[in-house]
Amino acid sequence: MKKKYRIKKNDDFQKVFRRGKSFANRQFVVYTLKQEGSNHFRIGLSVSKKIGNAVCRNRIKRYIRQSFHELEDQINPENEYIIIARKPAANMDFHEVKKSLIHVLKVGRVLKQKPNNSK
């Protein structure tokens, strides 16, 4: 995922927190805010120091970014997303992280239907 599709600035984070909707499961909280006219979604990641050391936090962020990259064609391109990892995410492998993100995005009705020709 390209860096221009990431949310980095505090003002952008606060805008999504204040105006957006939130959805959660045990591992992740997802805030989403619709941005009219955007041609690609943006994501911001937050992983607290309570979750683990830097290696653990960076691994979780890599897993989340890769999951969004693989789900790119199913995600609404007009939204901005903030993903906050919770403590149970520290012990998960990539496939568990992806499955959990799919679950929370379905709860929020953010994912489009899977194309029939996909694997």
Curated annotation (Swiss-Prot):
One of its GO terms (molecular function) is 3'-tRNA processing endoribonuclease activity. It catalyses: Endonucleolytic cleavage of RNA, removing 5'-extranucleotides from tRNA precursor. Keywords: Endonuclease, Hydrolase, Nuclease, RNA-binding, tRNA processing. InterPro entries: Ribosomal_Su5_D2-typ_SF, Ribsml_uS5_D2-typ_fold_subgr, RNase_P, RNase_P_CS. Transmembrane segments: none annotated. It is an enzyme of class 3 (hydrolase). Its EC number is 3.1.26.5. GO terms for biological process: tRNA 5'-leader removal. Consists of a catalytic RNA component (M1 or rnpB) and a protein subunit. This is Ribonuclease P protein component. It comes from Listeria welshimeri serovar 6b (strain ATCC 35897 / DSM 20650 / CCUG 15529 / CIP 8149 / NCTC 11857 / SLCC 5334 / V8).
